[in-house]
Amino acid sequence: MPSEAVLGQELLDERRTETRRYKLRFPTREALEASLAIEAVGGAVAVALPERRVISLDVPAAQVSFMAESFEAARQHYGAEIVEDYRYSLEQLDFYNPLAFAPEGEAQQSLDDVIEAIGAPQAWSHSRGEGVVIAIVDTGIDGLRPEFPHYKRHPRSWAANGEDPWTDWQGHGSMCAAIAAGTRSQGGEFDGVAPDAMIMSCRTHFYDTELAAIYDELTSLAREGATVIASNSFGVQSGSPPPVPADSDFIPALDDAIAAGVIVCFSAGNYHHLAGGTPDGHEPNSIWLHKGRSDLLTVGAAKPDGSMWYYSSRGPGQFPGQPLTSPKPDLVGITPPFGRVVYGSNVSVLKDGWGTSGCCPQAAGLIALLQSKRHAEDEPPLSRDQLFDVIRKSSVSLGHHGHSQGAGRLDCEAAVNRI
């Protein structure tokens, strides 16, 4: 297994076994600010959301019992409500397992082949993503990789307190960033779908409060006039419908970002087989929670030969027919078996492809191409609904049920030519 994956597993294990994350919600912002003294008695503030009256604390396992008194004081003196901070799962295909990786010599296709297959090079004569920000909400991005030169890094990239957004604790975020918007311009091995787009690294361990802080920042950028696209490859790893997370700050922050004009893409999930689905089947549903919303784009995974991956989550979504939902997935990207791609600080070969995680940033890159073309032509950006309509109508059907492929495989050239 590549060293970054080993390191990522070690860091994840350390976080799970040595710390716990708690969310404290206060009745007023003043109460929150007055309570921050509790940090000195065992808990370190990971995220502060003053406007939402919330902080989250990392508490070492050995200190949890000692923090009980401080938590009780926060309840009594400041009116705090205290719960464990909900954590989503990284959308990954057991990338911690050495068997998920293959030797370099076994590579069948690479990111270059995928970029060609989805028509990105043909679209570059019209647009390469300039003037658009793609936020990669993931495990961070390895700033040592030449695909991510300094001139492409957004200055408001985000990480929790004490962390660097341009480091990658697992490798997954670097993969997604390279697919969406990597560049060869400074010696990188690959171009992504939108090689001239700005990249905003949003490094997270997928806690609710971290995601809320990220989306609050994206909201601010959009309100300031930036064209922002968010690529998200996290969810709930389950073969059955999960309960809706209680007391979420992420979902209201997501609502605010979408209302401000942030265009949001999500991986459909890698759970079809966990739900008991067969490789060729289009049921049962395994697209969970907010990924069924009509105001975001949900992306599944197909192989280069047009067949569906056995793991790609099928629709129509957890809450079909309810208000503000639509049948999912919206479309699919391509990920090859034994596919060669950036992963952390290395270029690695992944036996079962890159998951729906590797397809979501393809869609984010396509949206960047579309919005960048509008900008270059001095035209206003397309609305969310216009973008989604163009992308769906230009997609190429692979002959599968809509619950598997949505509208089909994205086609960058056809989409750019459609506007």
Kindly label every feature range from the protein language model.
Residues 3-4, 12, 32-114, 121-122, ...:
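Autoinhibitory propeptides
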Residues 8-26:
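Short glycine-/aliphatic-rich beta-strand segments at the starts of folded cytosolic domains
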Residues 26-27, 85-86, 137-140, 179-183, ...:
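Active-site-proximal beta-strand/loop segments in catalytic clefts of secreted hydrolases
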Residues 39, 76, 128, 255-259, ...:
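Anion (oxyanion) recognition and catalysis
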Residues 122-155, 163-210, 225-227, 259, ...:
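Subtilisin-like serine protease catalytic core
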Residues 138-140, 146, 286-372:
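Extracellular S/T/G-rich loop segment that most often corresponds to the catalytic His/Ser-adjacent loop
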Residues 180, 200-204, 335-405:
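Hydrolase catalytic cores
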Residues 183, 202-295, 326, 345-361, ...:
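Substrate-binding/access-modulating region of protease and related hydrolase catalytic domains
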